[in-house]
């Protein structure tokens, strides 16, 4: 049984040293994602001129969302937004793995982000253009979902503390701090 009150405390320097390789590898992955996006845009002749055609998928099943997203891209969609399942903004954790049961939307998980990004990259290569992926990280796990999005090359991540304050009764201080931190991640 784990008793966190009896765990050995480590010096801040030792903690930072232990995390150094992990953080550098993670930052390198995010930089590589940004470069991959730039490479796709260059390969396909630059960015689109004019407004983007933005579509929403929200079946609750990531695999059905992929089917709809690919069809939308073939019909001209420039941005695919995957709507989160009802109530995910109130979860104080991020579910793990691919999900197939959501209500009014699909769970925002790192695996779901990865699955959709791959599908959009594949259809983008077929169509000769870059398809952007959008999701949402408002609510209790803003920084965590923003970090997952950066790791899986989401192009747009909407986050708004007021959503949680007005519609989910989330503590104002917490959600504003979360918004600040998640926007630092998104801005990187």
Predicted feature residues:
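Metallocofactor- and cofactor-centric catalytic cores in central/energy metabolism, strongly enriched
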Residues: 1-170
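Active-site pocket-lining/capping segments in soluble small-molecule metabolic enzymes
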Residues: 158-188
């Amino acid at each position: 049984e784990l008793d966190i009150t009896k765990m050995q405390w480590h010096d801040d320097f030792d903690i930072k040293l232990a995390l150094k390789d992990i953080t550098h590898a993670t930052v390198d992955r995010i930089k590589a994602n940004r470069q991959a996006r730039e490479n796709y845009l260059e390969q396909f002749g630059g960015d689109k001129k004019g407004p983007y055609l933005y579509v929403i998928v929200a079946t609750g099943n990531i695999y059905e969302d992929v089917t709809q997203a690919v069809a939308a891209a073939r019909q001209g969609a420039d941005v695919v937004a995957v709507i989160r399942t009802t109530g995910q903004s109130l979860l104080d954790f991020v579910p793990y793995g691919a999900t197939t049961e959501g209500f009014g939307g699909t769970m925002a998980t790192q695996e779901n982000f990865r699955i959709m990004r791959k599908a959009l990259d594949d259809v983008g290569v077929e169509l000769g253009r870059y398809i952007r992926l959008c999701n949402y990280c408002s609510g209790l796990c803003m920084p965590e979902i923003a970090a997952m999005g950066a790791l899986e090359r989401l192009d747009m991540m909407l986050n708004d503390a007021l959503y949680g304050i007005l519609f989910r009764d989330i503590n104002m201080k917490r959600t504003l701090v979360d918004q600040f931190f998640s926007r630092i991640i998104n801005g990187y």
